[in-house]
Amino acid sequence: MHRPCPTYTCCVTDALVRHAYAAHAAEYTRVLGAVDDMHQLDRRRIERWSGQLSGPVVDAGCGPGHWTDFLHQRGVEITGVDLVPEFIENARIRFPDVPYQVSSLRALDLADGSLHGVLAWYSLIHLAPTELPQVLSELARVLRPQGHLLVGFFEGESAEPLDHAITKAYYWSIDQMSRLLDDAGFDVLDVETRQDHGKRPHAGIAAITR
């Protein structure tokens, strides 16, 4: 079932993020909207994760839709959802065989337990520390038992703001993100990190619902 945005503050945050990305959607897509331009370890990580999936999947916060198409090309039954209409319009043009929808991750228009997987690849970084637990619970709601989640984020001191090019974002430590996942009903399966010279530390956590 669809759940309404829970608070006025959350809806304001969504509006700010939507506006910020809408203003940079064309540039963002040009610079970061192709899988070939992504780090090869990210490509391998997501492709390996996708091998476990056997049912409907959502790319939660799909942005320009490139990872959605990447998984679609590998036979995954996937839909991309994003808060930013400009991203969705562009994705539908670039990848016409893939379904995309405008939606907030706080209130997905999906039935309980309807998904086998959720990809949240750097799409949770703009959530304030007080907001992230509710969104993780929403992702757990739409996943079936033993459903798969893959989260990508910038690793650092938890809830510390980072200098993001588009709008305010936050670091998370692996320990804290793992605790939040546990609180939301997930069991962590594995963690991978990478550190590129002169760049922010990156982390990915694979988890399943209990």
Task: Enumerate the language-model features and the residues they cover.
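Conserved beta-strand signature within the Rossmann-like core of class I S-adenosyl-L-methionine
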Residues: Q146-F153
